[in-house]
A protein has these predicted regions:
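Alpha-helical transmembrane segments of multi-pass small-molecule/ion transporters
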Residues: 1-310
């Protein structure tokens, strides 16, 4: 019950951040299209800082085992759910924005502050495992779908700052190299902006939308159902039958972290990707807002269901 209450509080905070972005546009201080600059800052600066900072922990056998369990669970979720969502896309004729909004969760913005508040900072590393795995898919699958590219540009993928940050973070962890306190504190400070900055972008885009048109669009409610109900239930079944929680003394907590990452609203980074590559960013933002609103109810209930099942 404590986790469920903290979840609701964290999501409520995200809505206040969205409202701030909304107000700054409605007040005439900025235009909704100005959010594109902030989107690039989030994608190429703030998220890499989150990743690098998360891997600055001591190397121990227990930590490595926990990382392997979290990685296995995260990879299982990403691979199986990708096939499942792709199948749903063909059956229900989902477009590029809808497919990516259903598949990609808002783990980067919500899971880190949530895990910090509920479990403590020592567990943030494991939440970043899921985020790192998702980022690889995000900069390959999502980028290809949103940008409508015919093939993968592997050179751009490998040289992407987010992918580089993942490999550098892993290297620093396994070699035991610790960054100077000044650098690490800077990474932490910049990384802590990921939630507020992403939500402000969403609010700025939302301010330029027609509210009646958004909530009159029945497709949004169906996409919300897929993102917050169908996908989480599939994930719950996968985690249950995989028995990954039995592989570590901290297994149940690690599985909880991965499940939390899966059941979050649609990724705000999909909106940012749409902005950067010229897809329908307003529709993506509308899906993000509606799923975030609905997740106030769905996330606490799903966590309670997980605790009953495991």
């Amino acid at each position: 019950m404590t986790i469920s209450i903290l979840l609701a509080q964290q999501i409520a905070q995200l809505f206040l951040m969205i409202f701030m972005g909304f107000l700054i546009v409605k007040a005439g201080l900025l235009k909704d299209e100005d959010s594109k600059v902030l989107s690039k800052i989030v994608l190429y600066l703030i998220i890499p800082c989150v990743i690098l900072n998360a891997f600055q922990v001591d190397y121990t056998p227990e930590t490595v085992r926990g990382l392997l369990v979290a990685f296995a669970a995260s990879l299982l979720m990403q691979v199986v759910l990708l096939f499942a969502v792709s199948a749903l896309g063909r059956v229900f004729h989902l477009d590029a924005v809808e497919i990516t909004s259903v598949y990609y969760s808002n783990s980067g913005n919500l899971i880190v502050p949530l895990v910090t508040a509920v479990l403590g900072t020592e567990w943030v590393l494991y939440s970043c495992v899921y985020m790192s795995v998702q980022l690889v898919f995000f900069w390959t699958h999502c980028k290809k779908v949103i940008s409508r590219e015919a093939s993968y540009d592997w050179k751009k993928i490998v040289l992407n700052l987010n992918i580089i940050s993942i490999f550098v973070g892993i290297l620093l962890f396994f070699t035991g190299i610790r960054l100077p306190a000044l650098v690490n504190n800077t990474l932490h400070s910049v990384g802590s902006m990921v939630g507020p900055a992403s939500m402000i972008v969403t609010g700025m885009l939302f301010a330029g939308m027609d509210f009646r048109q958004i909530f009159a669009n029945k497709r949004i409610y169906f996409v919300t159902f897929l993102r917050l109900i169908a996908v989480p239930l599939m994930a719950l079944v996968l985690l249950k039958i995989s028995h990954l929680a039995d592989l570590s003394a901290d297994g149940p907590t690690l599985i909880l972290i991965v499940f939390l990452a899966v059941i979050t609203p649609s990724a705000s980074t999909v909106t940012q990707m749409c902005q950067v590559y010229g897809n329908d960013s307003r529709y993506a933002s509308a899906i993000n807002v509606v799923t975030t609103l609905a997740s106030i109810v769905t996330m606490p209930l799903l966590v309670m269901l997980l605790q009953m099942v495991l």
